[in-house]
Amino acid sequence: MRNRFDQQLELLNKQLIHMGELCEEAIGKATTALKEGSMEQAEKVRIADEEIDQAETDIERLCLKLLLQQQPVARDLRQISAALKMITDMERVGDQASDIAEIIITEEKSEALDIPMIIKMSEAAAKMVRDSVNAYVEKDLELARKVMENDDVVDELFEEVKTTLINFIAENKGLQGVEAIDLIMVAKYLERIADHATNIAEWVEFSITGIHKSSVV
């Protein structure tokens, strides 16, 4: 019975890794679409978001099956409960990537704005998602806590991007100013992705220690 349960837990890990990879790919495609003004890449993000939604459903079904058909001990129960919480944030990562793609699809792209800081934000946020899922699978508390710390890095990048673009808007009217507003929204979505990765890392911490940050007084 325990061997069967362990096999299902391993399947849960594999499905979470797959969902994390889908999230990371969605962020990457959204960033590529932004850099290249590529409608094709933006449409791929929409498809990826649908795949992420399906992955959430599959994992939720597996977790409920584990809870109902098995008798998990406290540590296993924390692991399954954390997975159920994590997939909610991972699904929202897909939504945020899709929101970025929507901006690219609905707005014209100008070549006037350089966006290296937004690309840097995107790479940092994607890495946070990847590391948070890996921390869960590897039961790596140190890595989970590093993800939480990196949220401050993305927050700082967002403030820098926002300040730069607000100054740009003050000096430029018309299409370029509108595009700068869109880029602020993109940066905000990336900041939210980092927040979701942090939430995932906090649930990883709970799965390992039994303590969740929100419950600490």
Q: Language-model segments: what does each one mean?
A:
Residues 1-217:
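Cytosolic, long alpha-helical scaffolding segments
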